[in-house]
Curated annotation (Swiss-Prot):
EC number: 3.6.4.13
Basic and acidic residues bias spans: 350-365, 586-595
UniProt-listed GO biological process terms: maturation of LSU-rRNA from tricistronic rRNA transcript (SSU-rRNA, 5.8S rRNA, LSU-rRNA)
Residue ranges occupied by any Helicase ATP-binding domain in the UniProt entry: 48-233
UniProt keywords, alphabetically: ATP-binding, Helicase, Hydrolase, Nucleotide-binding, Nucleus, Ribosome biogenesis, RNA-binding, rRNA processing
Swiss-Prot/TrEMBL catalytic activity: ATP + H2O = ADP + phosphate + H(+)
PROSITE patterns for the chain: HELICASE_ATP_BIND_1, HELICASE_CTER, Q_MOTIF
Main subcellular location: nucleus
A Gene Ontology molecular function term of the record: DNA helicase activity
Name recorded for this polypeptide: ATP-dependent RNA helicase DBP9
The organism's taxonomic lineage, starting at the top: Eukaryota, Fungi, Dikarya, Ascomycota, Saccharomycotina
Protein species of origin: Eremothecium gossypii (strain ATCC 10895 / CBS 109.51 / FGSC 9923 / NRRL Y-1056)
Record-linked InterPro entries: DEAD/DEAH_box_helicase_dom, DEAD_box_RNA_helicase, Helicase_ATP-bd, Helicase_C-like, P-loop_NTPase, RNA_helicase_DEAD_Q_motif
Length: 595
């Protein structure tokens, strides 16, 4: 969910205001304080259906269209009405559960919800249980029976099946929200959702919200399980995207080693203005790139699934505040064994089947390509996600240092830029098959299928009305930097990468756990905690940090402009620059020379 202050004007419904929905005055005040005046298109459609007709909602809308408030406003409004009618006999159970695929998204929903209940926090308490919290701490928090619980499916199942079953109460549950449904299914949470359904009062007028960026036939099972005659809303963001078309997409065919060379040239010469996210496919790959860039004095910060949740959230927050300009993000949650090309062309067949069992009340929209494939979930923290859902703001460029393994992942990655009506650039490095495996130290297994994946991506994007063009540059201009990259890359060994990985993890664990309470009491001290410090586990060659003028193009050379006329010879000065001294003669006896 994007704030309205950063949302594109194409998404706003200026014919309505939030007062049109007859919301609680406290909600209207909090919305006004946050800068929200007009609802977005998806909000103006979903809120009346949820509040007045009590319909289940299945909504398809892209990131930044206001999906989060589209379900939070009806949930909070109904809970406030429920509490006001009950009076002294207020229920003590949890009334709403919000399920999200990653812990980062859970944190974002918590922040939005806290702002929404700013003036009614005594009536509505919320709890984010997505993070791993000690049982001695979690028990008392659940015993307070918060009105709204935010969690990932796996964490909620863990609590329901554990010793906290008697502590948490879902018997009075009124709302179930499943946000980013397509991503939840991609991460393999189907079994967790079925387990959760056993603890829900599905036959007691439970209102469900299924929010997603795409609708496919996989959602049909969830629709049958949780919804009763839902209202299906589709936002016409394809027309919006075609109108603005501010995302420029390029690909560069380079060898494995030249990926590092191009990165060095691009960021050392500041060829990209603004903030950049670099996506890599493995954690080691991210640290290797960071260490190589450090050899040339280029600072960056790392975001991956090994880091603690608090550190990951702080990195995202600081990146959004423009503290860092370069973020290296590991996108290692999805590994695809084989992707069927027919699924890339499937289009909206899944959403058509979905609409058969429900009433399609409003179609603000369009056709969106969806991809499905045989998936193998990586054994990492599957509740981490950088390429999807995380609210990165004002990103100028997305650089796919390693091409993703599917066309679907490509769409998720480039979706981090050109958001809310702003322009952006996506650049992808592609390794030709003939270049694969020639440079073993920089080799990556997934690069073997780069050309095959690129063909699918181009085909998919062309169906959506976008073009991916080859990025042409003069190879001779960067050849002068090659010997410097070879020196810098040679210093970053596998041992150095492993040491950097351990050192970074130790630093972040210390900052995340031991200093957590201190930072809560002293929030200003948190500003001094940086994540882009140099790790220095490799041998750093200081001369590589400076680019000599002879490597720069003539337009970028400034030495000749600053230095004035320097004469070849100055006869007034001694050639050595100082007066010559006479050599002392033979030492004389001071007693004989005394007068």
């Amino acid at each position: 969910m994007s704030q309205q202050t950063t949302a594109s004007s194409e998404y706003l419904d200026e014919s309505k205001t939030f007062s049109s929905f007859q919301l609680d005055l406290r909600l209207q005040q909090s919305l006004k304080s946050s800068g929200f005046h007009h609802p977005t298109l998806i909000q103006s459609s979903a809120i009346p259906l949820a509040l007045e007709q009590k319909r289940d909602i299945i909504a398809k809308a892209s990131t930044g269209s206001g999906k989060t408030l589209a379900y939070l406003i009806p949930v909070v409004q109904t809970i406030l009405e429920h509490k006001s009618t009950q009076g002294a006999d207020r229920t003590t159970g949890t009334l709403g559960v919000v399920l999200v695929p990653t812990r980062e998204l859970a944190q974002q929903v918590r922040v939005v919800l806290e702002k929404l209940v700013l003036y009614c926090s005594k009536d509505i308490r919320l709890l984010n249980i997505s993070a791993n919290v000690d049982d001695s701490v979690l028990g008392p928090l659940l015993a307070e029976n918060p009105e709204i619980i935010i969690s990932t499916p796996s964490q909620l199942v863990k609590i329901l099946e554990g010793k906290h079953l008697q502590t948490i109460s879902l018997r009075d549950l009124r709302f179930l929200v499943i946000d980013e449904v397509d991503l939840i299914l991609t991460f393999g949470y189907q079994e967790d959702l079925l387990k959760i359904s056993q603890y829900l009062p599905l036959k007691k007028n439970l209102q469900a919200f299924l929010m997603s960026a795409t609708l496919n036939e996989e959602i049909q099972e969830l629709k049958t399980k949780f919804c009763r005659s839902p209202a299906i809303l589709k936002l016409n963001d394809d027309e919006i995207n075609k109108n603005k078309n501010k995302l420029l997409q390029y690909y560069v065919k380079v060898s494995e080693f030249d990926k590092f060379l191009l990165c060095y040239v691009i960021f050392k010469l500041s060829l990209i203005k603004g903030k950049t996210i670099i996506f890599v496919n493995t954690i080691d790959r991210g640290y290797r790139l960071k260490l190589v860039l450090e050899q040339f004095g280029i600072r960056s910060c790392i975001l991956n699934s090994e880091l603690p949740l608090n550190s990951r959230q702080h990195i995202v927050d600081e990146f959004n505040k423009n503290v860092y300009q370069l973020l290296i993000a590991t996108d290692d949650n999805e590994y695809i064994e084989e992707e069927d090309e027919e699924t890339v062309e499937a289009g909206e067949e899944g959403s058509e089947k979905l609409e058969e069992g429900g009433e399609k009340l409003e179609e603000i929209t369009s056709k969106t390509s969806s991809t499905n494939g045989k998936q193998k979930i990586a054994k990492k923290d599957k509740e981490y996600g950088a390429s999807r859902g995380v609210d990165f703001q004002n990103v100028s460029c997305v650089l796919n240092f390693d091409l993703p393994t599917t066309a679907k992942s490509y769409v998720h990655r480039i979706g981090r830029t050109a958001r809310a009506g702003k322009s952006g650039t996506a650049i992808s490095f592609v390794v030709p098959l003939k270049e694969y495996g020639k440079h073993k130290p920089s080799m990556l297994v997934t690069a073997k299928k780069d050309e095959k994946i690129l063909a699918r991506v181009i085909k998919q994007q062309s169906k959506l009305g976008f073009q991916i063009e080859p990025y042409n540059f003069d190879v001779k201009q960067i050849e002068g930097f090659r010997y410097r990259m070879e020196d810098g890359f040679r210093a970053v060994t596998q041992v150095a990468v492993r040491e950097a990985r351990v050192k970074e993890l130790k630093q972040e664990l210390l900052a995340s756990e031991k200093l957590k309470r201190h930072f809560e009491e002293n929030p200003h001290d948190l500003d001094s905690l940086r994540h882009d410090k140099e790790l220095h586990p490799a041998r750093v060659q200081q001369h590589l940090k400076r680019v000599p003028d002879y490597l720069l193009p003539e337009a970028a050379r400034e030495t000749g402009k600053k230095i004035g006329f320097v004469p070849f010879h100055n006869p007034k000065k001694n050639r050595k620059g100082k007066v010559a001294k006479r050599k002392p003669g033979r030492k004389s006896d001071p007693l004989k020379n005394f007068k």
